[in-house]
Amino acid sequence: MAHKKGQGASRNGRDSESKRLGLKVGAGQRVSTGSILVRQRGTKWHPAVNVGRGKDDTLFALADGIVVMKKTDRTYVSVIPQA
């Protein structure tokens, strides 16, 4: 057995801060224009009707309405306007 702790011990112990990614709004929920729907890295969810995509792939609402998600070959997020 080693009688010293080893040189790596004091250099370990770091962890990055979580980025709080994922869905921020569920299907069927009412949203207003500009609301963030999804925070993501890459395009796990794709924008559809009345949904925009930011430069960091964040999806946001372009109109007031109800969130709808549809899964085909990809998962699409839409906002259906409410009268």
Curated annotation (Swiss-Prot):
Keyword Ribosomal protein appears in the UniProt entry: yes
InterPro entries xref list: Ribosomal_bL27
Keywords: Ribonucleoprotein, Ribosomal protein
Keyword Aminoacyl-tRNA synthetase: no
GO terms under biological process: translation
GO CC annotations, alphabetized: cytosolic large ribosomal subunit
Pfam family, one: Ribosomal_L27
SUPFAM superfamilies named among the record's database cross-references: Ribosomal L27 protein-like
MF terms in GO: structural constituent of ribosome
Region ranges (Disordered): 1-25
Family: Belongs to the bacterial ribosomal protein bL27 family.
Name listed for the protein in its UniProt record: Large ribosomal subunit protein bL27
Organism: Chlamydia trachomatis serovar L2 (strain ATCC VR-902B / DSM 19102 / 434/Bu)
